[in-house]
Structures are given as structure tokens and as C-alpha cells.
Amino acid sequence: MRVAEVVRNTSETQIRVKLDLDGTGRQKLATGVPFLDHMLDQIARHGLVDLEVEAHGDTHIDDHHTVEDVGITLGQAVAKAIGDRKGIRRYGHSYVPLDEALSRVVIDFSGRPGLEFHVPFTRARIGTFDVDLSIEFFRGFVNHAGVTLHIDNLRGINAHHQLETVFKAFGRALRAAVELDERAAGQIPSTKGSL
């Protein structure tokens, strides 16, 4: 089974992430940031990842450290769960619509962290959630999972719909990329022989 648990403790946050990449989408989420919980639920359900996230952070200041550190810890957990990356498909992509919004996410488990984030949000906040924190979440994930990630919101008017399509597409792209390829069993998906 491809499971992992990672704990991250700093002076700003205490985070625990437990996941099963071959799950069914079950989740138990308690980050202290309700909108982040809603987005993590999209990753679990659409990525078919069993996901537990518990976070305690300095949200009395703002949600920045909690959101970023959850991204970091999730990236570490995914990297730990897939190990040497043998047999994975490596690449994944997804387009997801929600009413007027449409987003595309493309991921490569290349071992080279890189983020292209192009979401022209129509407002700065979704409820109390600062939309800029979504970039920090994905940057943290990318840097610690060792992936290249391209996120594009192709259209949208409602900022909630824009971000929800991003997280749903991310979950689906993640699922596709970490899926085991029977034809490449035991092989590193790279001509270099390593990722």
C-alpha cells in the first residue's frame, strides 16, 4: 500500500497529514481554515486519496502559515507515499468545469519543482479566505513533492468556482500521475533512469 504520514511542527504551525494514494476519497479534515478544508475535500474525493489533515496554526494572525504548511506537509506525504516513483504514470492532467468556470491542471512527477499558476481571480477573498494563499499552498506542495505543476483557470466569473475547479482538477491530475502503470511495472518513467 502507498500510504504515508508526515508531521511538521514549527513555532507557527503543527500539521499532521496521513494519506493513502490508493484510497476511495475518504477524508477527515480539521485545519482551522474552513475554506481550505473544503478544497482539501476536493483533492480527496476527485483524486480518490484517503486523506487526514489536522492543523493548528497562528490563525489569530492570519491563515498564511497554516495554508502554506499544509501544502508543504501534503507534498512531503505524497513524495513519501510514492517512494522511488517506479511504475507510476508520472504525468497527469485534467480539465474541470463548474458552471461558468473552467480550469486545467497538468502535473509531472519530474523531481524538478516548478509552479506556473495562472488564475485571474475576480475578487480577493472567498468569504474570509485570501485567494492569494492558494498560490502559497501549491508552491509548498510543489517544492516538497518534487513536481512541475501548471495551473490555468481558463475562464470564470465566480472566484469560488474558479478555485474549486482548480482543486478538483488538481485532485484528478494527481490521481492520474501517481496511478501505477502495469506495462511499466518496476520501471522509472524517465529515459535518465531516475527522477
Curated annotation (Swiss-Prot):
GO annotation, cellular component aspect: cytoplasm
Organism placement in taxonomy: Bacteria, Pseudomonadati, Pseudomonadota, Betaproteobacteria, Burkholderiales
Organism in which the protein naturally occurs: Burkholderia cenocepacia (strain HI2424)
Protein name: Imidazoleglycerol-phosphate dehydratase
Cellular compartment(s): Cytoplasm
HAMAP family xrefs: HisB
Any one GO biological process: L-histidine biosynthetic process
Pathway membership: Amino-acid biosynthesis; L-histidine biosynthesis; L-histidine from 5-phospho-alpha-D-ribose 1-diphosphate: step 6/9
Top EC class of this enzyme: lyase
Gene Ontology molecular-function annotations: imidazoleglycerol-phosphate dehydratase activity
InterPro entries attached to this UniProt entry: IGPD_sf, ImidazoleglycerolP_deHydtase, ImidazoleglycerP_deHydtase_CS, Ribosomal_Su5_D2-typ_SF
Short name of one Pfam family: IGPD
E.C. numbers: 4.2.1.19
Family statement: Belongs to the imidazoleglycerol-phosphate dehydratase family.
Catalytic activity field: D-erythro-1-(imidazol-4-yl)glycerol 3-phosphate = 3-(imidazol-4-yl)-2-oxopropyl phosphate + H2O
UniProt keywords, alphabetically: Amino-acid biosynthesis, Cytoplasm, Histidine biosynthesis, Lyase
